[in-house]
Amino acid sequence: MTTPLSSYSTTVTNHHPTFSFESLNSISSNNSTRNNQSNSVNSLLYFNSSGSSMVSSSSDAAPTSISTTTTSTTSMTGASANADNQQVYTITEEDSINDINRKEQNSFSIQPNQTPTMLPTSSYTLQRPPGLHEYTSSISSISSTSSNSTSAPVSPALINYSPKHSRKPNSLNLNRNMKNLSLNLHDSTNGYTSPLPKSTNSNQPRSNFIMDSPSKKSTPVNRIGNNNGNDYINATLLQTPSITQTPTMPPPLSLAQGPPSSVGSESVYKFPPISNACLNYSAGDSDSEVESMSMKQAAKNTIIPPMAPPFALQSKSSPLSTPPRLHSPLGVDRGLPISMSPIQSSLNQKFNNITLQTPLNSSFSINNDEATNFNNKNNKNNNNNSTATTTITNTILSTPQNVRYNSKKFHPPEELQESTSINAYPNGPKNVLNNLIYLYSDPAQGKIDINKFDLVINVAKECDNMSLQYMNQVPNQREYVYIPWSHNSNISKDLFQITNKIDQFFTNGRKILIHCQCGVSRSACVVVAFYMKKFQLGVNEAYELLKNGDQKYIDACDRICPNMNLIFELMEFGDKLNNNEISTQQLLMNSPPTINL
């Protein structure tokens, strides 16, 4: 027979204890709060474990009797003590059954002022099951805190106190697994997991409730069986975390000038409003005030697009997709109207020091005699001279690239204008082919005699036209050619005529001088174009040949530096030599074959 265990310490005596009804009443009245529940439950456990028979010897009944500090004054004999003990057990059984029924009815309704019975940990007589990591189970001890505070009492008949109860699949293992499952479900908490509902049958505060610490939880016990035979499962143990909860929208944005109270009044999310600084009205204004706002205030903040560049006059196409239209001073483009553009007139109004003149000499004025002799060599009539002068003047005026400044403070960039301080040929002209073709800078600055050469080609508009100083001019034998190029001129159309003239004099063994202002850009492009045509070279090969030279036939001209516009013109010239239908410039600039500006 198993001995029932009590939650309070008991004292075993060898003599027969004295007992009286007065002492029983005093015990129940003084210790009803602490040990009434424990004694009744232990007594009931004793009778359930021993069966329906209540007959026991005096030696068995003596250790299980409850010993108190009060001493009975009435002495009994051994025979009467046994009879009295049986009556005590009968009375105790009836009291315990009544106490259990009464506590089952009142277990779910705790009075507000009632304080649950708390037992010290040292009074536990049952060992805690292993593997729970100090987890306080409500089933391991009948009088635990969780069973008294948060759950209904469990029927003692369903609890197995066998030493091997951990091996049997009973209700204890089922409840333990269910609680472990509930712990695993609620361990991982995130921002979208709704908290578990609070227990309604507990009066203790839950402010210090920690989800991640299972040792500090008080998990309610599932009531597996009752008198009615119905099963109840706590919904909080099997609750799945809500991971599909839609996050709330961000709070509505507060307006820049609106009242602070209007922020929380609206729950609908709104997009940021239009900036009030541009419209000059506050967010609290009414709709009528906004509609009555003048359009002149909004027009002040309107972005004005920039003006079109000079090379895209009267053009509907994008300025970035059309190259500048450059004109040669040797001829006149008949398709262009001879008129001053509105941009040029606006330049004259804004700048007082800007004039539109032909840069044929150093004083930026037109030399009528030289321009007439260049275009009409065989005509000496004054009317023809005036017509030719007007034609050249109108051609230059129609190209806005030829705007020049008379101010002495203005200095053009080096890539657009050669500096006169460059002295690329301190030892005189450079031999660029078989001592017949020479490259040099302005001969007026170098003080050399141009009459020693059979052909002189001047391709710089900054240099003076020295045709009057060149003596004994004979066609195809002794000539002076003046072509006023700028750094942005379209030289590809003139290179065929110039290279043919050079090849003609070179074949006859005559000396040729090619020069510009510094001899490193425009005149160097003429020599490169001659190499391309004479030796059938590309632009890169011809350029490297002139720059590095040849030890026997060509001197190295390492100071040459044509700008990118002239390089593109050389590529255009190479395309024309190869009879290409689409030029390189058209491919690079993505422009159509003909452009009407």
Swiss-Prot record:
Residues 55-88, 107-228 are annotated as: Disordered. Residues 107-126, 169-207, 216-228 have a biased composition (Polar residues). GO terms for molecular function: MAP kinase tyrosine phosphatase activity; MAP kinase tyrosine/serine/threonine phosphatase activity; protein tyrosine phosphatase activity; protein tyrosine/threonine phosphatase activity. GO terms for biological process: cellular response to starvation; filamentous growth; hyphal growth; negative regulation of filamentous growth; negative regulation of MAPK cascade; negative regulation of pheromone-dependent signal transduction involved in conjugation with cellular fusion; signal transduction. Keywords: Hydrolase, Protein phosphatase. Residues 428-579 form the Tyrosine-protein phosphatase domain. Residues 55-81, 136-151 have a biased composition (Low complexity). The active site is at C516 (phosphocysteine intermediate). Disruption phenotype: Derepresses filamentous growth and decreases virulence and resistance to cell wall and osmotic stress. Transmembrane segments: none annotated. GO terms for cellular component: cytoplasm; nucleus. It comes from the Eukaryota. It is an enzyme of class 3 (hydrolase). The keyword Signal does not apply. Its EC number is 3.1.3.48. It catalyses: O-phospho-L-tyrosyl-[protein] + H2O = L-tyrosyl-[protein] + phosphate. Belongs to the protein-tyrosine phosphatase family. Non-receptor class dual specificity subfamily. Protein tyrosine phosphatase that acts as a repressor of the yeast-hyphal switch. Plays an important role in virulence. Negatively regulates CST20-HST7-CEK1-CPH1 filamentous growth pathway. Represses hyphal genes such as SAP4, SA5, SAP6, and HYR1, by acting through a CEK1-independent mechanism. This is Dual specificity protein tyrosine phosphatase CCP1. The lineage of its organism: Eukaryota, Fungi, Dikarya, Ascomycota, Saccharomycotina.
